[in-house]
Amino acid sequence: MAAIVAIGRKLARTPQWRIVQHQSLLRRAVSTSFSSSVSQNHSFSSAFHRAGHVHSQVLSYLPHFASSNRFSTKTISETFDINLTALAPLEKGLIDLIRQVSELESEADAMASLEDSSFDLNHDSFYSLIWELRDEWRLAFLAFKWGEKRGCDDQKSCDLMIWVLGNHQKFNIAWCLIRDMFNVSKDTRKAMFLMMDRYAAANDTSQAIRTFDIMDKFKHTPYDEAFQGLLCALCRHGHIEKAEEFMLASKKLFPVDVEGFNVILNGWCNIWTDVTEAKRIWREMGNYCITPNKDSYSHMISCFSKVGNLFDSLRLYDEMKKRGLAPGIEVYNSLVYVLTREDCFDEAMKLMKKLNEEGLKPDSVTYNSMIRPLCEAGKLDVARNVLATMISENLSPTVDTFHAFLEAVNFEKTLEVLGQMKISDLGPTEETFLLILGKLFKGKQPENALKIWAEMDRFEIVANPALYLATIQGLLSCGWLEKAREIYSEMKSKGFVGNPMLQKLLEEQKVKGVRKSKRMNLQKVGSQEGYKGQRSVDRK
C-alpha cells in the first residue's frame, strides 16, 4: 500500500461493447410493404418514432458481425469487459471539485478538501466517478484514492481503475494497485486479464505474454481459459500472427485444439477480414488433424460474406449442414448480409423464413444485416421499410442501426437521426460523432463538420482526444489551417496531451503558408514594378 500512496502523492501535485420475443415471421402485409412504391415509404422520423417506446436491450455498439468466442469454460470476452449496465448518477459539481483539488500542493490537502466537502460517496457513485474521469487518468486516480479512504474500493472499482490506467499506458501504477489488491486478498484474476488486454492494445505483446507467465505469482495457475484469454487479447487488437506463433510454441503445455485455432481464425475473419490468411488457418487445422466445429464454420462464413463472396458463403453453409452442424443465428446473419449486399434481397427474405423453420428467431443484428448493405447501396427507402418491419416485430434498433443510416444520409437528415438516437436512449456517442466527422471530412465538407462539432454540446458529448485529433486532421486535409490550429490550442488548454506529429504538421503548414504569402506579395510587387516600367516606356 505504501507504494501506491507514494505515487498518489506525486500525482496530486501534478495540475489532467438479447433476448427479445419474436411473434411470427414477416407478415404478408409487411412483405407487401417491401414492394410498395416510394410514396408509401416511412420517413426517418416515423420509422424511428416507435423505437423510443421499445426498450433496447443492446446498449453498446458492437462491430458488424463481431462473433463471440465460445470456449469450454465461460466466454473469455467477458473478462475484458467493463460493466456499464447501471452507472449511478453523480451529484452536480463533483467532477469540478475533483479538478479543483487536483491543483493543490499535496495529496493530504486534496484529501482534506474532498473529506470536508458535502458530497457523499458510495460504491455505485464511486464507480461512476472513475468512469466519468476515464479520459483523465490523474484525476481518476485521485478520485480512486479518495474512494479508497472512504472504503468504496470494491472489486469492480479496482478493476475499472486498472483498465483506466492501462488505457493510458500507466502500467507501473496499475501493477502497484494489483499488488495492493493481492495483499488484501482481493481477486486479481480479472485484473490480470485486463492487463493482458491493455498491453495488447498498446502493441506491447511481449508484456502481454509476460503477464500470462507471471500469473502464478498471484496464485493464478496458468490454465486453458487464461491461455485462450491471452490469444483472444492478442487477436482482438490485431496481433494475430503473434497469437498463432505463441499458440504453436506452447503446444507442449497447451495442446493445440479447435478452440485455440478458432481464436486465430476469428482474428483473421472478423478483426482483419483477411480471406487468404483465414483459408491458410483452415488448412492448418487439417494439418493438425483438427476437425472444424460449428464456430469454425461461422467464422469462415462471416469472412466470406463480408468480402461479398456469396458462392463460398453458401458452399460452407451447405457443407456445415451435411456434417450435421446446425447453423446458429450468426451464420444466418452473415448470409442475410451477403445476399442483401449482392442484390439478392428476395433470397435474403426467404432465408428469414428459413430461420423460423430452424427454430431460430431473427434479432436486431439480423435486421441490421439487411439495413447496412441497403444503406451502403443507397437504397434508403428499402432500408427504412426494413427498419419499420424490425420495430413492428418488437425489436429495438441498436446503435449499429443508426450508424448505418448516418453513413448514408445527407447533412440535414444526419441531425434528424441524431435526434432519434437520443430519443431511443442509444446515444449518440463519441463513436457516432467520429463516424460523422470522418464522413464529412472525406467528402470535403469542413463547414458541415464544424456544425456537427458545435452540435456535440447539445447531445452532452464532451470532446475527447480522439475527437479533437480527428477534427484537426480533417481540417488540415481540407486546407483549413487556422481553424485546425485554433482547435489544437483548445485541446491542449483542456489538459490533453498534444500530438508531436500533428504539432509538426501544423508548424510545417504554417511555414508553407508564410512562404506562399511572401511569394504572392513579391509577385504582386513585381507586376506593379513591371507596370510602372511599361508606363514610363510608353511616355518616352
Curated annotation (Swiss-Prot):
Chain positions covered by the region annotation Disordered: 514-540
Main location: mitochondrion
GO cellular component: mitochondrion
Transit peptide: 1-87
UniProt keyword terms in alphabetical order: Mitochondrion, Repeat, Transit peptide
Protein location: Mitochondrion
Record Gene3D superfamilies: Tetratricopeptide repeat domain
Stretches forming PPR repeats: 154-184, 188-222, 223-253, 257-292, 293-327, 328-362, 363-397, 402-428, 429-463, 464-498
PROSITE patterns: PPR
Family in the record: Belongs to the PPR family. P subfamily.
Protein name: Pentatricopeptide repeat-containing protein At1g80880, mitochondrial
